[in-house]
């Protein structure tokens, strides 16, 4: 592991941030051995910390990024680049967007630089069978090689699965599981692990809330379940929690409440895949556990030769929401 001692994190972060202000899409080509070092060192840190993180406010929580690197940089511009703010990301760093490598490398670099202030959970796309298909494998193969993709897989298999903020906000990528009776069950999951096709770990990364379901329902994804508002209320009451914070679904405003504000979905990739007009959002949790939302507005759609009124530059809108 002598190579890890030579890992120059500051230089890696500096190069990844140099493209700020460049035209979106400009790549940062790190050396292969640097990326390998990021995977190995962050993996070590993930395994040294709990699989169920216990975090303290204040912090900022972000949903799916999906390789939209320049939008990730915008999130940090609005929220403050680490270590100015503490962060928790809810997974789905790779696939679908054009710059999964820059995205995951910056996040892993910040994890290594600020291990007690910067946290990354596992999403359903941090799984070999998924990111083999939806873009990350192809990006690794095109820009580096398949061996590097396998190194990322070894790292992803060690990511934490859930977090609880100040004993009151339960955070995971997907949602609840009919198998989840005690937090101890999450703590007992051994890493490294792949994501199974069913069961607790699968559900935490794959399930979805559904306002039309009573109890548990079938999931259109063909994986895991959907769950209704009553499931949320019972879970919160049983574990003395106030809120579930999850990602995993595109929502128009970047955030969306469910079950009388007992659950919030966060999605942080605006104009997702270039196909949606959604905003992206980040949730700020202050010391009193008041939650507010910072919104990344979607880019204006350019209409050829159409005259349109001048609009102020797109930017941040903060909405207060009492929890």
Curated annotation (Swiss-Prot):
Pfam families assigned: Metallophos (PF00149), STPPase_N (PF16891)
Gene Ontology biological process terms, A to Z: blastocyst development; cell division; circadian regulation of gene expression; entrainment of circadian clock by photoperiod; glycogen metabolic process; MAPK cascade; mitotic sister chromatid segregation; neuron differentiation
N-acetylalanine: residues bearing it: 2
Catalytic activity: O-phospho-L-seryl-[protein] + H2O = L-seryl-[protein] + phosphate; O-phospho-L-threonyl-[protein] + H2O = L-threonyl-[protein] + phosphate
Segments of this protein annotated with the region Disordered: 302-323
Induction data: Up-regulated in synovial fluid mononuclear cells and peripheral blood mononuclear cells from patients with rheumatoid arthritis.
Keyword Cytoplasm listed: yes
Effect of residue 125 to A: Loss of activity
Reported modifications of this chain: Phosphorylated by NEK2.
Further comment: Microcystin toxin is bound to Cys-273 through a thioether bond.
Record-stated family: Belongs to the PPP phosphatase family. PP-1 subfamily.
Protein's name in the database: Serine/threonine-protein phosphatase PP1-gamma catalytic subunit
Organism: Homo sapiens (Human)
Taxonomic lineage of the native organism: Eukaryota, Metazoa, Chordata, Craniata, Vertebrata
Gene designation: PPP1CC
């Amino acid at each position: 592991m002598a190579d890890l001692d030579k890992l120059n994190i500051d230089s890696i972060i500096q190069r990844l941030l140099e493209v700020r202000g460049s035209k979106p899409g400009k790549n940062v080509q790190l050396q292969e051995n640097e990326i390998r070092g990021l995977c190995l060192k962050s993996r070590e840190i993930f395994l040294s910390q709990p699989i169920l993180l216990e975090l303290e406010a204040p912090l900022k929580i972000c949903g799916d990024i999906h390789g939209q690197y320049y939008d990730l940089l915008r999130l940090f511009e609005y929220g403050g680049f680490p270590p100015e703010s503490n962060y928790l990301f809810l997974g789905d760093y790779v696939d679908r967007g054009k710059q999964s490598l820059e995205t995951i490398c910056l996040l892993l670099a910040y994890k290594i630089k600020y291990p007690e202030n910067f946290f990354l959970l596992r999403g359903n796309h941090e799984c070999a069978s998924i990111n083999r298909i939806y873009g990350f494998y192809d990006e690794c193969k095109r820009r580096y090689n398949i061996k590097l993709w396998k190194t990322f897989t070894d790292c992803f298999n060690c990511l934490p699965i859930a977090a609880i903020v100040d004993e009151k906000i339960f955070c995971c990528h997907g949602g609840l599981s009919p198998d989840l009776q005690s937090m101890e069950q999450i703590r007992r999951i051994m890493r490294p692990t792949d994501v199974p096709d069913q069961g607790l770990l699968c559900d935490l990364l794959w399930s979805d809330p559904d306002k039309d379901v009573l109890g548990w329902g079938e999931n259109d994804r063909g994986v895991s379940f959907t769950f209704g508002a009553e499931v949320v209320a019972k879970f919160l009451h049983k574990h003395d929690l106030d809120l579930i914070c999850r990602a995993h679904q595109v929502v128009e405003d970047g955030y969306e409440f469910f079950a009388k504000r007992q659950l919030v979905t966060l999605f942080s990739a605006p104009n997702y895949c270039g196909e949606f007009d959604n905003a992206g959002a980040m949730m700020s949790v202050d010391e009193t556990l008041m939650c507010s939302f910072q919104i990344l507005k979607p880019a204006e759609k350019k209409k050829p030769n159409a005259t349109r009124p001048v609009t102020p530059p797109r930017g941040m809108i903060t909405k207060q929401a009492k929890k």
